[in-house]
Amino acid sequence: MATDPRTMLVTCALPYANGSIHLGHMLEHIQADIWVRYQRMRGHQVHFVCADDAHGTPIMLKAQQLGITPEEMIAAVSKEHQADFAGFNISFDNYHSTHSDENRELAELIYGRLQAGGKIKSRTISQLFDPEKSMFLPDRFVKGTCPKCKSPEQYGDNCDSCGATYSPTELIDPKSAVSGATPVMKDSEHFFFDLPQFEKWLAEWVRGSGAIQEEMANKMQEWFESGLQQWDITRDAPYFGFEIPGAPGKYFYVWLDAPIGYMASFKNLCNKRRDIDFDSYWKADSEAELYHFIGKDIAYFHCLFWPSMLEGAGFRKPTKVNVHGYVTVNGAKMSKSKGTFIKASTYLNHLDPECLRYYYAAKLNSRIDDLDLNLDDFVARVNADVVNKLVNLASRNAGFIAKRFDGKLAATCAEPELYAEFANSRTAIAEAYESREFSRAIREIMALADKANRYVDDKAPWVIAKQEGADAELQAVCSVGINLFRVLMAYLKPVMPLLAERAEAFLAETLSWDGIEMPLVDHTVAPFKALFSRIEPAKIEAMIDASKEDLAKEQAPKASGPLVDDPISETISYDDFAKIDLRVALIKKAEAVPEADKLLKLQLDIGGETRQVFAGIKSAYNPEDLEGKLTVMVANLAPRKMRFGMSEGMVLAAGPGGKDLWILEPQEGAKPGMRVK
């Protein structure tokens, strides 16, 4: 156990709740989980939390496309995300959502403190506005021609072709990505977080706290030199998020409440556990440690805005912001068409999660380098290291111990110096884990595995087994081999927890960091069972093919048309239909109902009888255009008393509503009063 136990809160960046987890996401979550599991092995108290980032325009619009509420969509996505993380053995203590009571309360608290401290400013700004959808357009929801290189179909904040950044208003021929309409400029009052007030404090914190990697600190210096700007934290309705207190129709920008989601998830955990004090972790003078694991694409928010918000609101700042690079596959950006944009669930359907955990660990360091998942190297390395070196070390010794000695290890360690060398390596491996130099830790472990296998090769227990009177030597050699395997598995336990569990079952012992100081002697192990399977190249091919199928499903034409929006009702009997008396009617007179937004009053001739009907078609027809037309009405509908008069039937019309309504018009030759069958 650690001599000085530490108290830590560890977070991963919050996945956005409008899509699936993929292997790019998994890099960060595996990296953080390995570090957390190592710290727990050392006896430290660690709380590991995450949540879904569940607010914003993209979620609102996608939910509309799916025909469900945003709440329904984010609930379904959260369930999927949590299943994926569980599948990769990510050991979260809590997984929550930014769309929660805890996050609302904390966002309002932090905003209130910033506002009271003079850190919130307001001013009127002009933004692009979609006149058809009646909504302001975020940068990524405007497309047009790049003002610099003239490439078409570029987003409103930067050009994918030339890399230029610009304002949406600078786009040439901008179009709304929501409706296709040409946006107009419209004024709106917005609230801003006054980041420049924190510039001096930020510069000192970046260089003096040790919280930021050197590469990131150098990048932040560039941001300081270009000048910090006030940060717009407002979005206008319609928007899915939290309304700003005292500002109806104004909402917190998703990036304001997203990092507060770390606090909210931890608060939710505290409410569940009752033995954890929230304030002791988040008060300004907290002695607990706070670690964020994030990707380099969101470093700007986590290294500038987030610590400044915490400082302005009187909360503690991160101990360390650990930034990592992107994942590439086979040396290139993940590609859906090539099948290398691999969802976590697709991977889990084909391969062992421990394989990816090991491969990522073997390539991860503390820098912001991109990591390439080379699938050929992935197969070769996992099979060579985990199967051939590690698992084989156990299997080639366990058989002799089981068959010849009933699973009993020797009473003493025959190679105390060799064992001590392995056990003493934990200092260097611990330093590598602590500093997130996982690739260095794996190199150290695999170098030991090579040495252990050389020992077995040199001793050749399969030869000793054939020699008469050599049982003691055979037991001694194989016991050393199994003990060296035990040390290696203890070192790999943070990386491959499931393999470690299976190894523990074989060893009949829980693997611990300090427990490996002494070897297992006079100890009975369980019968050996296969611990791990080789990766077959065919499984890689199947996974890639399945990823292409995922793309095909995404690209399949979405069903559209009236039946999608308004499905056919339940089946009725012929007798039910026969009860409805439909008649041709002549519209003799039509007039607007001044007190009603949607109604026209119609006088209908149905062949010797006149009926008065109020019809909700005012949005689609001028009264004078209807007079003299034939239509169809339900003639035997019970009269309905309305405040404008009695309605004596119903006119039939097709369409979703608004301007899109069309009354039924019988062809020439039909006469008022004729039954429609």
From Swiss-Prot:
Keywords: Aminoacyl-tRNA synthetase, ATP-binding, Cytoplasm, Ligase, Metal-binding, Nucleotide-binding, Protein biosynthesis, RNA-binding, tRNA-binding, Zinc. PROSITE patterns: AA_TRNA_LIGASE_I, TRBD. Residues 576-677 form the tRNA-binding domain. Its main location: cytoplasm. Gene3D superfamilies: HUPs (3.40.50.620), Isoleucyl-tRNA Synthetase, Domain 1 (1.10.730.10), Methionyl-tRNA synthetase, Zn-domain (2.20.28.20), Nucleic acid-binding proteins (2.40.50.140). Binds 1 zinc ion per subunit. A motif ('KMSKS' region) lies at residues 333-337. It comes from the Bacteria. Its EC number is 6.1.1.10. One of its GO terms (biological process) is methionyl-tRNA aminoacylation. NCBIfam families: metG, metG_C_term, PRK00133.1. Is required not only for elongation of protein synthesis but also for the initiation of all mRNA translation through initiator tRNA(fMet) aminoacylation. Belongs to the class-I aminoacyl-tRNA synthetase family. MetG type 1 subfamily. This is Methionine--tRNA ligase. It comes from Aeromonas hydrophila subsp. hydrophila (strain ATCC 7966 / DSM 30187 / BCRC 13018 / CCUG 14551 / JCM 1027 / KCTC 2358 / NCIMB 9240 / NCTC 8049).
